[in-house]
Amino acid sequence: MQAISLRKAINTLHLWLGFISGIILLVVAITGGILAFEDEIRNLTEHDLLYVEAQQKPKESVQHLLEAVREYNPKAMVTQVRYFGDPEKAAQVYTKDKKIYAVNPYTDQVLGVRDQEKNFMFLVLSLHRTLFLGHVGEEIIFWNACVFLVILLSGLFLWWPRRRKQFRQAVTIKKNASVKRRYFDLHSVAGFYVFIPMMFVVVTGIDMAAGGSSAPKKKSNVTEGIAFAASNYDSALHQSYHGEPVESIRITIPKDSNDVIGVSIRYETSSLRKQTAFVYDRYSVRPLSSDKWQDKTFRQRFFGSDYEIHTGRILGLPGKLVMFLAALITASLPVTGFLIWNGKRRKKRTGLKSGSPA
């Protein structure tokens, strides 16, 4: 009797949380499915801004890339510069007005500009992360992800077969079944198959939406009396990078006179992210701190790889495909859940009408 009451309570919780989060879950799942293949879509639609012809010479300095962008647009306020380990990839220069300048790293030529407020993939990403509602949207997405975690766990409880003999039926969509049964199978069985990938998605999603972990902010020492030079960016880069195979290198530009130079190096890996970050005084280029991937615990590296796990790219193309299919199936769950509920509601109404006095 207690087991039945518990099951009924969890079923009610599952139902109402589904009502609360269903529409948002639908939007987030569809956009998430698209973002699983973000790189492939960009390579097709933005190839000329992402790739250049590799040359047998060193890449240009950070200082020269900054000068090229400021010559192209004197009003550009640069926030970061990004190089890639792939010799055929263009460098990227980010600015405060949410634009990304594609620059040939061998010639300093500006190839073009992407506006993050108009670019299709950036709009999909913004919808996925904020629902186009800014900080309020970020909060909604965070709490919706927490709700979805409860939905997943309660759904697994409701799916779990009471007897071993029922297991095969619980993992199979019955053929030639009634419409009502088909809706139930599409919801219950499909939900079971996406449970594991969606657990990874929701746990990493919650961590990303919460902002992850951040180290205390360092400051540059303005009182040293040393004038700042643009070449300091390259000095910081040379102290940090010594020719190892990398996926990308990001140099963060100070926001003001007290801010620091940041250098973040993401090394090549086929597993959890290997990323080391260095912080330098912008005037003396004196090292202020470092956060090396070798010193991180498994948990730190796991959550440091949030994005790779969240999108499936940690397992390459197969991982992306799994997350894409899981996202599409997840998008269907609020729909099939509503159809199941609506079918029961209609049945109750029909029963009440047939049982009413003439």
What are these regions (language model features)?
Residues 1-358:
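Conserved histidines in hydrophobic membrane contexts and catalytic metal-binding motifs
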